[in-house]
């Protein structure tokens, strides 16, 4: 049986991304791509809001505690610049054109401070 203590960072990240995808779809977004990669990096989740024709690039941060700071500390200006670059590369490769583009961060907290409870999700919209 896999527990939080025995999970690898990759497994923990995959669990957080799955929870984030479930949340996004429950909010009415359609998932276009997961773990899109190119030579410059990776985009965790790419979703769209069909009602507003907005494409949303989502960075997912999964934490088991506050050891590395909160969600605001997890996404630096450098990380936002990287996400913008990756989003631009993804968009350049698409035939569809979008009315708007947004970069969001979803924080997923699991683990000791959240033991026995449903994972806590925090959604920051339009960070860059």
Curated annotation (Swiss-Prot):
Source taxonomy: Bacteria, Bacillati, Actinomycetota, Actinomycetes, Mycobacteriales
Family, similarity comment: Belongs to the UPF0102 family.
GO terms assigned for molecular function: nucleic acid binding
Protein name, UniProt field: UPF0102 protein MRA_2923
InterPro entries registered for this protein in UniProt: Restrct_endonuc-II-like, tRNA_endonuc-like_dom_sf, UPF0102_YraN-like
Disulfide bonds: none
Source organism of this protein record: Mycobacterium tuberculosis (strain ATCC 25177 / H37Ra)
UniProt feature coiled coil, ranges: none
């Amino acid at each position: 049986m896999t527990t939080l203590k025995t999970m690898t960072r990759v497994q923990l990240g995959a669990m957080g991304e799955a929870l984030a995808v479930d949340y996004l779809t429950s909010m009415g977004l359609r998932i276009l791509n997961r773990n899109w990669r190119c030579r410059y990096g990776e985009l965790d989740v790419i979703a769209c809001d069909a009602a507003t024709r907005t494409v949303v690039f989502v960075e997912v941060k999964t934490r088991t505690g506050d050891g590395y700071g909160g969600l605001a500390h997890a996404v630096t200006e450098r990380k936002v610049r990287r996400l913008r670059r990756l989003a631009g590369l993804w968009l350049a490769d698409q035939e569809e054109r979008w009315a708007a583009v947004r970069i969001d961060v979803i924080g997923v907290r699991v683990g000791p401070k959240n033991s026995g409870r449903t994972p806590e999700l925090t959604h920051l919209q339009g960070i860059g």
